[in-house]
Regions:
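Catalytic beta/alpha-barrel core
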Residues: 4-6, 15-22, 30-39, 52-63, ...
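Structured loop/turn residues at beta-strand edges in well-structured enzyme cores
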Residues: 27, 74, 121
Length: 133
């Protein structure tokens, strides 16, 4: 299981962006991230075509299956979910369709119950909710 954002475990820095200007102000080691909204598909395409490492954050409590697969066509490093039920469903899709993107659940890393749920459902990884401000 990947663990991102833990103070004792080194990980890349996530930078929330809204447009390509945000990409230009990031460093090569940063992972840019943005909301999984259909209006951001162009941003995902830009990242894919220009070799920019990016992640997509699914904020909704209801995953839009078409949006999930459309964003995955542009090969994000991570698909980050704030809702555990959506993370579990996305993980099933990622496993069944052999997607390259890793599924992460954004959580309080001190919540032992959520760790158990993630492990039981074989979620690829977790990320501290504090890493995504």
């Amino acid at each position: 299981m990947l663990i991102l954002g833990h103070p004792l475990i080194p990980s890349d820095r996530f930078i929330f962006i809204k447009n390509t200007d945000g990409i230009h102000s990031s460093t090569n080691n940063d992972i840019v991230c943005f909301e999984a909204h259909p209006k951001n598909l162009e941003l995902a395409k830009y990242c894919c075509e220009n070799g920019v490492h990016f992640s997509v954050i699914f904020l909704s409590h209801k995953i839009e299956t078409d949006t999930f697969f459309l964003f995955n066509a542009f090969k994000p490093l991570y698909c980050i979910f704030k809702d555990i039920k959506q993370a579990i469903l996305a993980q099933q899709h990622a496993t069944n369709y052999l997607l390259d993107s890793k599924i992460l659940f954004s959580m309080d890393l001190n919540d032992t119950e959520l760790w158990e749920i993630c492990a039981k459902n074989q979620i690829d990884g977790v990320i501290s909710k504090d890493s995504l401000l």
